[in-house]
Amino acid sequence: MARRLQDELSAFFFEYDTPRMVLVRNKKVGVIFRLIQLVVLVYVIGWVFVYEKGYQTSSGLISSVSVKLKGLAVTQLQGLGPQVWDVADYVFPAHGDSSFVVMTNFIMTPQQAQGHCAENPEGGICQDDSGCTPGKAERKAQGIRTGNCVPFNGTVKTCEIFGWCPVEVDDKIPSPALLHEAENFTLFIKNSISFPRFKVNRRNLVEEVNGTYMKKCLYHKILHPLCPVFSLGYVVRESGQDFRSLAEKGGVVGITIDWECDLDWHVRHCKPIYQFHGLYGEKNLSPGFNFRFARHFVQNGTNRRHLFKVFGIRFDILVDGKAGKFDIIPTMTTIGSGIGIFGVATVLCDLLLLHILPKRHYYKQKKFKYAEDMGPGEGERDPAATSSTLGLQENMRTS
């Protein structure tokens, strides 16, 4: 055991291997070798350099978005009368940023005032006062219970509450949507971006977009792909959804602005690409999008409000992209990596030559040469030998 360990250590410290070039005249191996090199060459040039632009350094962007909407809608509702709805009425928030809601439908509870009234059946049905704990508010309650059980209508009793009365009843959503004209509303998107690494600034109002063009253009992915004015109906349809059904219960639509810029060309070629996505599926557990807001006023010294349950389309504007420009460092790194990948051809062909082909033993003899130290060198004495020689023994094993 000790002798074997000594031999292993001796071999580790006192042996050295060096590559030996062997020219193999084998058509099969030669063709495979060149094919692998060709595949590597196509990968390095076609994918790494041309498609992935491995010769460029890249930079992310910083972005700012603002929006403006235009359009009018008219409603005729009991308790509210005829009303014209403009952008100040149906856009939330009113200043418009990268995320906003356009109201398309609503349920109004008019003339609410603080007082006592019967709760909505969803907030608590009762048989007598024992079922109404004073001061308690259920999950769907619209006020604080007083402890009394009172008639809600001719057939149902509910707990009396103190809160805004009369309570909201929202089980019937108007169909079609009250603000169905929203399909023709227009949205103007103003987007400014910067690539800080390259000190390049761009806007979506590119060179082709001027004042005259903007007054008459409306975005179309083929006819007017650079127009920053969008029809809400077109945006929703391009997201894969139906505007009328979305307008009734609300939903969410994503608008992406993608900037992929090659700054090796003139900066005017850096242009935005718009895409639209439906972000809520129809089979969502909680379909639609809604929220509530109130209009407060004073009538005969009493604080009152009109309560609106708003159904609307929420638009989220997302900006993404990057810019690339030639740089010698990534270029040299990519070239070096590509040259290294060429070594794959040698490894695979050696595997085929030395372990798979029928004449593998013969090729091993030609590939590897074993050199041994046969004795002391010139000027050295070997007490165990009558003479000093230096020789090389080549072990040739035939297949």
Swiss-Prot record:
Q: Where is this region: Pore-forming motif?
A: 331-338
Q: Which Pfam families match?
A: P2X_receptor (PF00864)
Q: Which residues carry this modification: Phosphothreonine?
A: 389
Which tissues show it?
Answer: Expressed in smooth muscle of the bladder and arteries.
The residues that the entry says bind ATP are 70, 186, 286, 290, 292, 309
Q: Name one GO molecular function term.
A: ATP binding
Some GO term, biological process aspect, for this entry: which one? establishment of localization in cell
Q: How does it sit in the membrane?
A: Multi-pass membrane protein
What sections of the protein cross the membrane? 29-50, 339-358
Q: Cite the Gene3D superfamilies for this sequence.
A: atp-gated p2x4 ion channel (1.10.287.940), atp-gated p2x4 ion channel domain (2.60.490.10)
Q: Where is the composition biased (Polar residues)?
A: 385-399
Domain of life of the source: Eukaryota
Localization per Swiss-Prot or TrEMBL: Cell membrane
> Where on this protein are sugars attached?
153, 184, 210, 300
- Cited InterPro entries: P2X1_purnocptor, P2X_extracellular_dom_sf, P2X_purnocptor, P2X_RECEPTOR_CS
Note the PROSITE patterns from the entry.
P2X_RECEPTOR
What does the record give as the reaction this protein catalyses?
Ca(2+)(in) = Ca(2+)(out); K(+)(in) = K(+)(out); Na(+)(in) = Na(+)(out)
Its Gene Ontology cellular component terms are: external side of plasma membrane; glutamatergic synapse; membrane raft; postsynaptic membrane; presynaptic active zone membrane; protein-containing complex
Where are the annotated segments for Disordered?
A: 374-399
Protein activity control:
Activated by low concentrations of ATP (<1 uM). Undergoes rapid desensitisation. Sensitives to the ATP agonist:alpha/beta-methylene-ATP. Modulated by cholesterol.
Spell out the NCBIfam families in the cross-references. P2X
Instruction: Tell me its family.
Output: Belongs to the P2X receptor family.
Q: What does the protein in this record do?
A: ATP-gated nonselective transmembrane cation channel permeable to potassium, sodium and with relatively high calcium permeability. Furthermore, CTP functions as a weak affinity agonist for P2RX1. Plays a role in male fertility, bladder contraction and platelet aggregation. Specifically, plays an important role in neurogenic contraction of smooth muscle of the vas deferens, and therefore is essential for normal male reproductive function. In addition, contributes to smooth muscle contractions of the urinary bladder.
What domain comment accompanies this record? Answer: The N-terminal 20 to 23 and 27 to 29 residues seem to play a role in the cholesterol-dependent gating of this receptor.
Q: What is this protein called?
A: P2X purinoceptor 1
Q: Which organism is it from?
A: Mus musculus (Mouse)
Name the encoding gene, please.
P2rx1
